[in-house]
Structures are given as structure tokens and as C-alpha cells.
Amino acid sequence: PSLPGWATKNCLPTLFAENLDIPMSQAGLMSTITIALSSFIGVILGGTLSDKWVQKNIRGRVYTGAIGLGLTIPSLLLLGFGHSFVAVVGAGLLFGIGYGIFDANNMPILCQFVSSKYRATAYGIMNMTGVFAGAFITDLLGKWTDGGNLGLGFAMLAIIVFIALAVQLYFLRPKTDNME
């Protein structure tokens, strides 16, 4: 899921400029505000939902993160193939909410599987892996942009997110909310 996160941070202004035929100065501001505002909303929603759900179901955090990932799938498709202002900006808002919901639950889910003795290391490895993924996807989408296929690249990220969602739901089966 780091791939679409980095893709939006690094390439969404270009996608907005191309798909909406607006200057990059407007596209950069529009994409930054869209993602930042909606991600903040997603973090608040995702954190609140997860904290309540885990009290009733130990997999509540996993399910909350999965809901967030699920929201990013149609938004990536619409970001990639949309050409109207409402479609593209709406998809950006939906992506931000979904990503915020997912992101708010990364550390809480990690706490369900990794002892407090190793959490900083585990989170550091997770972040480092995400940064490497970000470098990879930025380079790849840059090449796709040069070939005129940035939108297709965004849409294809939906496939990767779907696979990550399936893996998360199948394999993440916590036994506690806080591994000691």
C-alpha cells in the first residue's frame, strides 16, 4: 500500500494537470490540499472506528485498515481514467480518506503482532520498505508519464492494492490487541 501513497504524493499534481488540463501551479496546490485534508479526515475516522471495533472484535483494526484499502481501489481507477473535475478531485478525496483510515491503523496493527521490545525496529523496517517502494513507483510512473500512460499506471495500482487487501484479510489474525 505504500506504492499508491507515494504515487499520489509524487505524481498526483502531474495527473491533475494532464487530466484536467490545468496549469501545474494549480494542480500542485489542488492535489496537496485534496490529499492532506481528506487523509486527515480518514485518520480521525479510522482511528475512532478501529479503537471501538477492536473492543468487540480482535480483528477490528485489521478490518478497519481493510476498509481504508478498499476505498482506495475505486479511487485509483477513477484517478487514472477520470477526466472531469468532479471525478478526479472526488477520487482524490476518496483516496485520501481511505489511505488515512489505513494509515491510522498501521502501528496499532503492528502492536498486535510485535512485542514492545521490537516495535521501533519493526516500524523502522516497515517505513524503510515503504520508502524503497516509493522510490520504485516514482521512477516507474515517471517512465509511464514520459510514454503518456500516467493514468493507466494509477489505475494499475488498484490491482496491487486489491492483492494487498486480500493478503491482509487472509493472513492478519491477531490474538491480542497488544503483544507484550
Please provide the spans of the model-predicted regions.
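Extracytoplasmic gate region of multi-pass secondary transporters
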Residues: 1-44, 103, 107, 138
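Interfacial helix-cap and linker-helix signal at transmembrane-aqueous boundaries
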Residues: 16-17, 49-50, 54, 141-149
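A membrane-interface helix-boundary motif in multi-pass transporters
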Residues: 23, 60-63, 140-160
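Conserved glycine-rich helix-kink/hinge and helix-boundary motifs of the Major Facilitator Superfamily
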Residues: 28-29, 66, 120, 124
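A late C-terminal transmembrane helix in Major Facilitator Superfamily
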Residues: 43, 111-147
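Cytoplasmic membrane-interface "Motif A"-like loop-to-helix N-cap segments
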Residues: 51-68
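Multi-pass alpha-helical transporter architecture, strongest
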Residues: 75, 79-81, 155-180
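Hydrophobic core of transmembrane alpha-helices in multi-pass small-molecule transporters
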Residues: 85-101
